From Swiss-Prot:
Pfam families: LpxB (PF02684). This is Lipid-A-disaccharide synthase. GO terms for molecular function: lipid-A-disaccharide synthase activity; phospholipid binding. SUPFAM superfamilies: UDP-Glycosyltransferase/glycogen phosphorylase. It catalyses: a lipid X + a UDP-2-N,3-O-bis[(3R)-3-hydroxyacyl]-alpha-D-glucosamine = a lipid A disaccharide + UDP + H(+). The lineage of its organism: Bacteria, Bacillati, Cyanobacteriota, Cyanophyceae, Synechococcales. Belongs to the LpxB family. HAMAP family: LpxB. The keyword Lipid metabolism applies. Condensation of UDP-2,3-diacylglucosamine and 2,3-diacylglucosamine-1-phosphate to form lipid A disaccharide, a precursor of lipid A, a phosphorylated glycolipid that anchors the lipopolysaccharide to the outer membrane of the cell. Its EC number is 2.4.1.182. GO terms for biological process: lipid A biosynthetic process. It comes from Prochlorococcus marinus (strain MIT 9303).
Amino acid sequence: MVRLLISTGEVSGDLQGSLLIQALQREVERRSLPLELMALGGPRMQASGAELLADTAPMGAIGLWEALPLVLPTLRLQSRVDHVLKQRPPDAVVLIDYMGANVRLGHKLRRWFPRVPIIYYIAPQEWAWRFGDGGTTQLLSFTDRILAIFPVEAEFYAQRGAKVTWVGHPLLDTVSVLPDRQLARERLGLKSGQRLLLLLPASRQQELRYLMPTLAKAAALLQQRDPSLEVIVPAGLASFETSLQKALEAAAVRGRVLSAQQADELKPMLYAAADLALGKSGTVNMELALRGVPQVVGYKVSRITAFVARHFLRFRVDHISPVNLLLKERLVPELLQDEFTAEALVQAAIPLLEDPAQRHEMLEGYWRLRQTLGVPGVTDRAAKEILDLTKP
């Protein structure tokens, strides 16, 4: 019997965790090895077969101010999880993204279980941030192996002494077969010639507050220009659905909010049918790129967090979208903090909706990006590495 603990947070981490769990189940079946999976994650990981010790999907926040409401819930959650892990120690630990919480957990588990391998899959993007090497040093102090999803990530951590395996980007396993665009448009009820705009605002509660009103206002302005424009907003979590609907109504947008369940079921159809997406920075940018959807990216945090990051932490980053970070160019328009306005979103969106040359340029850049990400079979390679490192 092998007992694994997988820890992640937020909507994107829950998705990646569920894909890894499915790959682990395939690999243990091949090895005829009994497997017990414990998880800090979300409903997708639970549905894939893990025992959910705590639901961390709603717990993500970026910024000091934004994280304050989560302090007490997080402490209560940690206390419950600590009790379980002391009663049922894992044979290996897999950390997925979710930097702050997973770094704290990694340090704790290294103290408690010195011989248990700790594997970081989808490690923090230290290679992209100009913060110095303090965070990297912390991460390497408790990590036995990093399973890197980007070549630049693998090189960065290897140069600093980590044991690294580059497995490729896990989204490659989910986009190998795309639905037919015309069939997808018919399934979504789109008329001939009608454009589809996706709004993708949030995998964290704070992002609903800071991003969605501006995205909705931009959608309303675009509908003034093209009254037939269809707007769809897929909910990342069921708890987001009401807030998303209210934001559309407040901006007088004619559009639909898809429930979290509908969003999961229809995601390939949405991407196949979409003409443009406006949304937050993060994993979704990579998914849009791999599915060939032109996009405009924005992000905003509280003024307090922005001030602290700029003036005290000296936070600097060349790009906020992973697409641009990997290509080392501004292929995807980015609007950060005060630049993130409805008018600026519209100005960036119009060429992508109306100029075929602009669309072609972005799609060509997506193709170049795709060549750097490896080949499908990513989660199977990650599962094999994890089990090879695990000693029951």
